[in-house]
From Swiss-Prot:
Identification of the protein by name: Centrosomal protein kizuna
Biased composition (Acidic residues): 603-613
Subcellular location field: Cytoplasm, Cytoskeleton, Microtubule organizing center, Centrosome; Cytoplasm, Cytoskeleton, Cilium basal body
Record carries keyword Coiled coil: yes
Biased composition (Polar residues): 198-223, 442-455, 631-642
Stored InterPro entries: Centrosomal_kizuma (IPR026742)
Coiled coil region boundaries: 77-124
Quaternary structure (record): Interacts with AKAP9, CEP72, ODF2, PCNT and TUBGCP2.
Biased composition (Basic and acidic residues): 286-324, 343-359
Gene this protein is translated from: KIZ
Key words, A-Z: Cell projection, Coiled coil, Cytoplasm, Cytoskeleton, Phosphoprotein
Organism: Bos taurus
Amino acid sequence: MTERSGRGGGTRGASALPSPDYYEQVAHLQQGLRNSEKKRLDLERKLYEYHQSDVCRAKLKYIKLKKYLKEICESEKNARIRNQEYLKQFERIQANITASLEKLQELKIEFETQIKKMQLLSKDSLGKKGELKDEDKEKVVMRAEINSGTAMSRGLYQPATIFMGRQMSAVSGIGDFTTERKSPQPTKNFSIPDPHSHQQTAQSSDVTGSRVVQTPGDTQCLNKSDKIDGKTSLQIGEKTPVTASALSEEEQTHCFEIGSNACQSKSNLSEGKKSAELHSPLWERLSPENRTTDLKCDSSRRSEGSEGEILTREHIEVEEERARPPVSPLSGSESCASENECPQEKPPARKASSDHLPCEDSQSQEPFRKKQEEQEEESLSSSSDLTVSVSEDDLILKSPELQTNLGDTMEQEDGTETLNVIHSEQERDAPSTGKPNCILQAPSTPDSPNESFTNLPAKELCNHSDILREGPDAYRTAVLHQLSQLCPRGGSDKEQVRFEQTPASGLLRTRSGQHIAALKGHDTFVQEEEVAKLSGVFLVSKLDQRTKATALLKKDLAEEHDNRLAVHSSKSSCSLPSTPSDESGIRNGKPTLWPKGVTTREQEDESREESTEESMAARMPITETKAYQRLKQSALQGSTHQAGDGFQEATAPTSQPPGLKTGSGTFKTKTTHKIASEASFSSSEGSPLSRHENEGKLTTNLKSKAFWSESDESNSEIEAALRPRTP
């Protein structure tokens, strides 16, 4: 320590150099470091080489495989343990299955034995039943042979149950017609036709005699009850021919008791003529020829009974019709149609039934038929209802096809009224019937809205039987009233179109022409207003059809109108009634409805010039107000007192019948304005027609401004259409 300190002191002080020992030590340390480093590198190189060698790899694989082997061994052990457990479970299940199989096998054996026993028992029972059936069949055959032998030995005869598709007879009882009734006495054989099945059941019993006897006089009509044992079989009044098998009084009374007990009704059995079959031998009665004759006789007797019943019913109906009080012409016409159609429908039935009738029966029925026909003719001639001679056209109207062609209910009612008018006019025009008391009745329908108290005078006049004695004016009024019923809402209504409805419209047009001819024959002046009223029935919406309808009426009146227009110029039908107005003094009233086409040539030329105004005014409907109805009523009552001036009564617009209303169509509006234009044109020409028109303005003033103010329609256009134009 001294040295070090000295050294240290000497270095410090003397700054001496390091000694060689130091260097040697350092060199020695460095050498050792180099050697250790070389070793380290050698070891690393060897390790690397070793890792790269196969031995090392094999060792690594071996180690890995060894580890895997250990794992496999462990998993194998676990699997063995699990498999052992599974085996134990399988053994247990197998033990259970074997036990159940043994039980099922035992049950199978038991069931098989039971099935075998049941099969054996069923075979035994079927065999026994078959043996019993065979024995029963043998017994039935033996009984049938015995019964047939005894029946043939006794000589009994039962006719065939089915002949020509009809069951002729069968053994039946009284109550249900299924059991056999035995009686100590011989009875009669009933043959009752069933209307539903067209089969015939017979009631029979043992007959002690050796003969089967039929009498033609035993066919009677028995009144049967509606139900027998709760089943509807025979209706009341059904024809039931009765065939007798014996002729004693005891048998008749016994048959009467059977009929009264079975059917609960009265039966009047009467014996008729004895036929030659009473003395005929048995083998003749049982021959096929006699069987067919018996069937024919039965059918003829049934037809005789039905014919007699039909005739008696006809006689009763005729007596009831004669005793019945008169009804409305609608029902009267229907009754006449039915009475006229019945004789036409009955001759085929009589002809069909007469084919099976014997000569004696037909001759016996002829007096009764003649008497019946005479009674029917007397009842028809003495009937108080409307009776006419039926023609082919009327039969067409009566046929049901007319009702299907009419379309709706309103047109059917109008068709019925048309038929009544045609009947009345046909009876009036017929040359064979010279009776003047034609009955013209309006159908009294309580639900008709068009009838009112204003119709009473015309109806009373029309219902009068001696209408021709009242004068031509009343005659014309009645016919026009009847025609007005055909179009209560106006002829121009589209629902009331009749021109396209054939054959009713054609017949009506022809009858209208006959009516005009009848008016001429009674020296009644026919004027243009009547043509307008008659043509109102045929008004339609189209212009060409209106022209056709009025041209048919104009044909009969063309020549006479021109001749009488000059004669009766002082009583012109074109007078337009007017009343003094508050503003203009005189205002034209409601003009008369003229048909298109019944005008002069000058008027037709004037109407063509004003066609535009007419088309505008035609679209405005005309409505009949209450004031106008009251005006018509007062005018009608005033016109009845003016019998002398019949021409002006029929032509004045207020004297039209109450039933003829102003419709809401276009044709009447056109004629209204056309008359105004014609009147203005004729006044400028100075014709006699216009002169009397001016005279009528001063005398027949009936309308005023107050009347137009009372109108229900407040529309100015409607009032303008209703108010006539001033010339």
